[in-house]
């Protein structure tokens, strides 16, 4: 007998596994893939009261839906779970034991640095095929060429095409989880057939951001084609499955293509980045109420991240987006990590990053607070670049000696005080986002922002 499942609380998001047409008037019909929110448990534990995305409520059968979960923190997602990196020929043969025809893995070549080796178990022994890397393409036979390892594996999975056998079963590297399986299990996998890509709205070094249509709704889609880059973006997507707040850009789902493409689908923010929004409108259009509202929107998102132990690490007006109805939402979770983790900082935006984060790679909610102070300065200067007229190389030495930017023209003194509090050199002296929100609400209530 199966254990009785604990009832899902109100607010739980579910994804439909099948179509449900409904038989009674109180039923809520839905299609496979729809996202539904639980409103309440009914007397019968097999049925829930739920609402769909347009707010219509009704009764749904529990066994037709699955609960959406965050991808577990610490799960090592991989687009290539069969890729084992630098292992020797002998280690590969041990991993493919006991022999099973079609069991395979890919490793880095030990004899030919820069190339790879496909190791396949076949009729009791292991065959090793060199994958040559030439002119940015991969090939085993120098006849068929592939853009990346995923395309190569997909090809030989459907057809042996000269190998001893077609690839049947990947030998998954210990500790990794196939990304597609995990997004599917946790209810975040979307169907490529239902996504229409309409036009490019942004270009990044990783690929394009496109306006799309998913089941009749406008969406933004990050299209990542390169397998190494896609691997890095998996971390961003899995962080986004754990976060839900009205001032964070909402993940709608992920599509992992067998050929190696990764599509991250989010809500569409019609008015673009906050920095462009501010620059294109300026003082004549945007009054004090509007600037303070944007400041509070961002602060509430950051208070939520603070409360859930996430550090954003790249907070700036360019990474805040504005919706059709003028709500500011924090986006770009590429560097967001659980608070305890450290990482190599690579190319950090010097003018937005706290001194201790630049110096010792110490990231915390308090370094996010420093960046929030810079973002407030951007808002009240209508999108100017911080530290105007100071050469980039001089910014850090001056800041470490205690230099703080002047208030932007026309900035209310009370708001400038909040900025300066964010720029304490001693991180412990900076306010929390909870305190910052309270300070901004005090300014709003007492109309100190006008």
From Swiss-Prot:
Region (Interaction with PTPN22): 9-70
Phosphotyrosine: residues bearing it: 184, 304, 416
Domain SH2 span(s) in chain numbering: 82-171
Keyword Iron: no
PROSITE patterns given in the database record: PROTEIN_KINASE_ATP, PROTEIN_KINASE_DOM, PROTEIN_KINASE_TYR, SH2, SH3
Modification type N-acetylserine: residues: 2
Keywords: Acetylation, Adaptive immunity, ATP-binding, Cell membrane, Cytoplasm, Immunity, Kinase, Magnesium, Manganese, Membrane, Metal-binding, Nucleotide-binding, Phosphoprotein, SH2 domain, SH3 domain, Transferase, Tyrosine-protein kinase
CDD domains: PTKc_Csk, SH2_csk_like, SH3_CSK
Modifications made to the protein after synthesis: Phosphorylated at Ser-364 by PKA, leading to increased activity. Autophosphorylated.
Location of the active site: 314 (proton acceptor)
Pfam families cross-referenced by the UniProt entry: PK_Tyr_Ser-Thr (PF07714), SH2 (PF00017), SH3_1 (PF00018)
Domain Protein kinase: 195-449
Top-rank taxon, per record: Eukaryota
Domain SH3: 9-70
Tissue note: Expressed in lung and macrophages.
Family: Belongs to the protein kinase superfamily. Tyr protein kinase family. CSK subfamily.
Subunit structure as annotated in this protein's UniProt entry: Homodimer (via SH3-domain). Interacts with PTPN22. Interacts with phosphorylated SIT1, PAG1, LIME1 and TGFB1I1; these interactions serve to recruit CSK to the membrane where it can phosphorylate and inhibit Src-family kinases. Interacts with SRCIN1. Interacts with RHOH. Interacts (via SH2 domain) with SCIMP; this interaction is dependent on phosphorylation of SCIMP 'Tyr-107'. Interacts (via SH2 domain) with PRAG1 (when phosphorylated at 'Tyr-391'); this interaction prevents translocation of CSK from the cytoplasm to the membrane leading to increased activity of CSK. Interacts with LRRK1.
Protein name: Tyrosine-protein kinase CSK
Gene expressing this chain: CSK
């Amino acid at each position: 007998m199966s254990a009785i499942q604990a009832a899902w609380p109100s607010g739980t998001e579910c994804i439909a596994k099948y179509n449900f047409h409904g038989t009674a008037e109180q039923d809520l019909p839905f299609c496979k893939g729809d996202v539904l929110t639980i409103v309440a448990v009914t007397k019968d534990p097999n049925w829930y009261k739920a609402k769909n995305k347009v707010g219509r409520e009704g009764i749904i059968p529990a066994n037709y839906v699955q609960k959406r979960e965050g991808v577990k923190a610490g799960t090592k997602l991989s687009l290539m779970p069969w890729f084992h990196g630098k292992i020797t020929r002998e280690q590969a043969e041990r991993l493919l034991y006991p022999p099973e025809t079609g069991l395979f893995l890919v490793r880095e070549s030990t004899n030919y640095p820069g190339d790879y080796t496909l190791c396949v178990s076949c009729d009791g022994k292991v065959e090793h095929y060199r994958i040559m890397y030439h002119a940015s393409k991969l090939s085993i036979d120098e006849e068929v060429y592939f853009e990346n390892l995923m395309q190569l594996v997909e090809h030989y999975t459907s057809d042996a095409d000269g190998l001893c056998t077609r690839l049947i079963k990947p030998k998954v590297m210990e500790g990794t989880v196939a990304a597609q399986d995990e997004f599917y299990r946790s209810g975040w996998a979307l169907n490529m057939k239902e996504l229409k890509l309409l036009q490019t709205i942004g270009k990044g070094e990783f690929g394009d951001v496109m306006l799309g249509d998913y089941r009749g709704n406008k969406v933004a889609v990050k299209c990542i084609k390169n397998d190494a880059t896609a691997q890095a973006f998996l971390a961003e997507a899995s962080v986004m499955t754990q976060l839900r707040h009205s001032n964070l850009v909402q993940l709608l789902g992920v599509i992992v293509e067998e050929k190696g493409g990764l599509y991250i689908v989010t809500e569409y923010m019609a008015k673009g980045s906050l920095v462009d929004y501010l620059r294109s409108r300026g003082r004549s259009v945007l009054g004090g109420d509007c600037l303070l509202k944007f400041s509070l929107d961002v602060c509430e998102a950051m208070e939520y991240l603070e409360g859930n132990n996430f550090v954003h690490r790249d907070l700036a007006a360019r990474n805040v987006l504005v919706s059709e109805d003028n709500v500011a939402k924090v986006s770009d979770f590429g560097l967001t990590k659980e608070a305890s983790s450290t990482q190599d900082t690579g190319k950090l935006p010097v003018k937005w990053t706290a001194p201790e984060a630049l110096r010792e790679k110490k990231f915390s909610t308090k370094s996010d607070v420093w960046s929030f102070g810079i973002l407030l300065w951007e808002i009240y200067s209508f999108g100017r670049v911080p530290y105007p007229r100071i050469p980039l190389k001089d910014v850090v030495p001056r800041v470490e000696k205690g230099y703080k930017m002047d208030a932007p023209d026309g900035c209310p003194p009370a708001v400038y005080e909040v900025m300066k509090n964010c720029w304490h050199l001693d991180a412990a002296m900076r306010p929390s986002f909870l305190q910052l929100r309270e300070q901004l609400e005090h300014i709003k209530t007492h109309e100190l922002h006008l």
